[in-house]
Amino acid sequence: MQPPGRAPTQGRTLIALFEGQQYPVTKEEFVIGRGQKTSDLTIRDSNVSRRHACVVLYNGQYWIVDQQSTNGVEFNGGKVDRKVIEDGDLYRICDHEIQFVYR
């Protein structure tokens, strides 16, 4: 059993769910943005920065980190600069929702 507030990363894969697609996070820096060549998860929207946010692995936990984007990353109605990703978390980037699950 995981202590409260800890993402269950050990032995499980983090999956980003976006527009019916699954994007496994399989590296230490997973880029979310508008840039097709520079992003692991591409959002085609001019309001999304080329390199909008990253998912990074730090001390055994995945974090979502805003990359000083123009429009930010929202969680539970408020903007976040960085946050530990927990199972089921739902983030908004402009008008787009990305949910993260561990499998």
PLM features per residue range, with description:
Residues 1-46, 56, 96-102:
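Intrinsically disordered, low-complexity acidic Ser/Thr-rich regulatory segments
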Residues 18, 58, 70, 75:
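Short, ordered coil/turn segments that flank beta-strands lining enzyme active or ligand-binding pockets
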Residues 68, 74-103:
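C-terminal boundary/linker segments immediately following FHA domains
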